[in-house]
Amino acid sequence: MASGELACRYAALILSDDGIAITAEKIATIVKAANIKVESYWPALFAKLLEKRNVEDLILSVGSGGGAAPVAAAAPAGGAAAAAAPAVEEKKEEAKEESDDDMGFSLFD
């Protein structure tokens, strides 16, 4: 990760924490005050990204999407999703039945 990108992230967090509107000029001012050299496009890029989004919402939603993404990508559309769900449940039940039969008492199988 580039240090310029990280500096702009921190500057945006500082502005958001103080309740100040996030603009490219303000991000550049904070980065300049920290004596960090940043490419000129980073402050504008972050300002454009964050003008439509709330920083607090982004922070709160960081961990909420991790496990759901693979399931959503694998799920078929429409009525096929309902048909696929029972098939998955049946496979889980079969695995439980097999594991109940073999309790691990035979050491040399």
Swiss-Prot record:
Gene3D superfamilies: 1.10.10.1410
Biological source species: Zea mays (Maize)
GO CC term, one of those recorded: cytosolic large ribosomal subunit
One Pfam assignment: Ribosomal_60s
Record-level GO BP terms: cytoplasmic translation; translational elongation
UniProt KW Ribosomal protein keyword: yes
Tree of life domain: Eukaryota
Protein family: Belongs to the eukaryotic ribosomal protein P1/P2 family.
Name the UniProt record assigns to this protein: Large ribosomal subunit protein P1
Segments of this protein annotated with the region Disordered: 85-109
Gene Ontology terms, MF aspect: protein kinase activator activity; protein-containing complex binding; ribonucleoprotein complex binding; structural constituent of ribosome
Gene: RPP1A
Tagged with keyword Magnesium: no
Job of this protein: Plays an important role in the elongation step of protein synthesis.
Annotated InterPro entries: P1/P2_N_sf, Ribosomal_P1/P2, Ribosomal_P1/P2_euk
Quaternary state and interactors: P1 and P2 exist as dimers at the large ribosomal subunit.
PTM remark: Phosphorylated. The N-terminus is blocked.
UniProtKB keywords: Phosphoprotein, Ribonucleoprotein, Ribosomal protein
